[in-house]
Amino acid sequence: MAISEASKSSHELPVTTAESSGKKATAKKLTLIPLVFLIYFEVAGGPFGEEPAVQAAGPLLAILGFLIFPFIWSIPEALITAELSTAFPGNGGFVIWAHRAFGSFVGSMMGSLKFLSGVINVASFPVLCVTYLDKLFPVLESGWPRNVCIFASTVVLSFLNYTGLAIVGYAAVVLGLVSLSPFLVMSAMAIPKIKPHRWGSLGTKKKDWNLYFNTLFWNLNFWDNVSTLAGEVDEPQKTFPLALLIAVIFTCVAYLIPLFAVTGAVSVDQSRWENGFHAEAAEMIAGKWLKIWIEIGAVLSSIGLFEAQLSSSAYQLEGMAELGFLPKFFGVRSKWFNTPWVGILISALMSLGLSYMNFTDIISSANFLYTLGMFLEFASFIWLRRKLPQLKRPYRVPLKIPGLVVMCLIPSAFLVLILVFATKIVYLICGVMTIGAIGWYFLINYFRKTKIFEFNEVIDDLDNNVNGEHPKVDDHNS
């Protein structure tokens, strides 16, 4: 399709940053190393949470999963994120991509599905944190002490996010290094005890494929979430591809080394491989001191995961407000810290309400909604190559459209498995949320037409925007 033939909606999306909005321009704060660790915490945060893959399918399939899955999922998703984030470096992220490809309805659906999956994912981290803490403090296993701990941790960590992305970025560096250090010690101490034949075990005959695939997916996805922070990055065209490359390698190594070490050194009943088992394995390998160290690392990792995911969700809401998909007040920033406090508050409150769900249902629901969003993302990526071939892309995936189709079809097959193996409660939760996302689009249009809320209006001409020039946002009602 020729660029001049691209259809235009009534409020075509631009790529906006703080500089192109009505806000006072501020210096971008994310440089390479903090961005690498934010991506790392968007995706992984360490080997915490990989244990159920062994419980579901045995050591061999767990190892193969973490070896192969990055090639069929993580790398393609990271490549797409690198190309589109550098072509459209704004806080709208994947919302911009979907809208530019297919229009406002698809852009709105993409934003809603990814936001809902994001806040559900945020809800899982206080739960994971308390799951490790209750091994040190059994009183947190259930009842009101556990609920109070989840509530308090959510409030405190949300306030940390409010203090600024620069603080969150550098905190992620420290949290990442400290939380990984006990695993390096454990892996080194496990070497004399490793028996390689244990790696070939298939475990029990009955496999829990739902748990297996959801564990792999949950531990190795969300690479594109960092796209909602693109407007806050120094030189995103250069920084994003390099940061994603480093993060992919770093994340895969962080999963595989402890997995090889523990499955090779420890022989236990497969049912014991549940969330938190790495801490028990550390005690078997080196003693209680290492178990405590890993549990402390798990808490720190959960903090990093929470901060990174909450940042993405909050800045996504700000980006959608900048682009006219949400009322302007969603993009309000703090006068003290220049952070999108409304986005942080809404994301934190929603995640708090969801954090009392069953942990497995939390993961499965986040994966299901994310899967629906990824189908839209793959389609948007390919269609933008066809629709806007002359668009300036500082980083371009080195494939033509047929190759891109194949690259996207392989992970799409895995997405189908996620949908097929979902449970009834997950279908129910995600069905209601998807219907709600459709209704939200029409409700927002009603608000815009009746001027109940104030929206940004964006005037964009794709014919004059193929070289990466980003039109301004008119700061008035649409």
Swiss-Prot record:
Keywords: Cell membrane, Membrane, Symport, Transmembrane, Transmembrane helix, Transport
Pfam family, one: AA_permease_2
GO molecular function term, any single one: polyamine transmembrane transporter activity
Transcription regulation in keyword set: no
Membrane association type: Multi-pass membrane protein
Annotated Gene3D superfamilies: Amino acid/polyamine transporter I
Any one GO BP annotation for this protein: polyamine transport
Subcellular location: Cell membrane
Record-given protein name: Probable polyamine transporter At3g13620
Classification of source organism: Eukaryota, Viridiplantae, Streptophyta, Embryophyta, Tracheophyta
